[in-house]
A protein has these predicted regions:
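The beta1-alpha1 cofactor-binding region of Rossmann-like NAD(H)/NADP(H)-dependent oxidoreductases
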Residues: 41-42, 63-73, 105
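Residue(s) in the substrate-gating loop at a strand-loop-helix junction
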Residues: 143
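C-terminal helical subdomain
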Residues: 179, 183-187, 204-250
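Conserved glycine-rich Rossmann-like NAD(P)H-binding loop of the short-chain dehydrogenase/reductase
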Residues: 30-47
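Active-site helix of classical SDR
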Residues: 123, 159
Length: 250
């Protein structure tokens, strides 16, 4: 039986774990050739080998999304190694929470560079390729934090609100070229993201939120939403998907 994405090429950033890894598995399982980008090359290589041994096509590319040159090379590698680029999933991200007052400025810089500039750089490299092909799909991973701001997450909110704004403006620019744009906004997902935080109040708040939700989302839940969006007919442009675990209030 033919896969829904047979003949398609997808590039996924932040592919070494969490939502990125789950998305690689979901898209490859539907028949797509996948380019895996992240800094942890050992994990990428192992995952790409697993996909290839299962009969799929995959290439692992060391990627630092904060470098425009690295982002451009990643997109070029997808083209040269796999034969094109149909889908880009901008998943790489970090979440470093805490109050504005006294915040380590390097953490703010990291979030802006990874969550915003990284997404911009990869998109900038991908759009001309997709425009030339007459079609494409860009999926940007935002968050519920891109819809509602809360104390203790000001700069993370800023980055994710920015993802939403950029995605809508991009949609207006490129939809006439056959390029679709989707923003995915997950709630609490069981990934490494929460473990980036060290501020005691933040760590406690995350743990309390986890306890307040009967069952948090899994990375595969988000990957399923991405697969849904990218397998719709070309006439269907799924622009926004908000996903919370049942019981999450905010």
């Amino acid at each position: 039986m033919a896969g829904l994405l047979d003949g398609k090429v997808a590039a996924i950033t932040g592919a070494s774990s969490g939502i990125g890894e789950a998305t690689v598995r979901a898209l490859a399982g539907a028949g797509a050739a996948v380019a895996l980008g992240a800094r942890r090359v050992d994990r990428l290589t192992a995952l790409a080998s697993e996909i290839s041994e299962g009969g799929g096509r995959a290439t692992a590319v060391e990627l630092d999304v904060t470098s425009s040159d690295s982002a451009s090379s990643f997109i070029s590698s997808a083209q040269s190694e796999l034969g094109g680029l149909d889908i880009l999933v901008n998943n790489a991200g970090v979440m470093l929470l805490g109050p504005v007052e006294g915040a380590p400025l390097d953490q703010w810089r990291t979030m802006v560079e990874v969550n915003v500039l990284g997404l911009l750089y990869c998109t900038h490299a991908a759009v001309p390729v997709m425009r030339s092909a007459g079609a494409g799909h860009i999926v940007n991973i935002s968050s519920v934090a891109g819809r509602s701001a809360n104390a203790g997450s000001a700069v993370y909110n800023l980055t994710k609100f920015g993802v939403g704004a950029f995605s809508e403006a991009l949609r207006q620019e490129v939809s006439s070229a056959g390029i679709r744009t989707t923003v995915i906004e997950p709630g609490f997902v069981d990934t490494e993201l929460q473990g980036h935080n060290e501020h005691p109040a933040v760590v406690e708040g995350i743990e309390q939120m986890r306890k307040s939700v009967p069952e948090v989302l899994q990375a595969s839940d988000i990957a399923s939403a991405i697969l849904y969006a990218v397998t719709q007919p070309q006439r269907v442009d799924v622009n926004e998907v908000l996903i919370r675990p049942t019981g999450q209030r905010r």
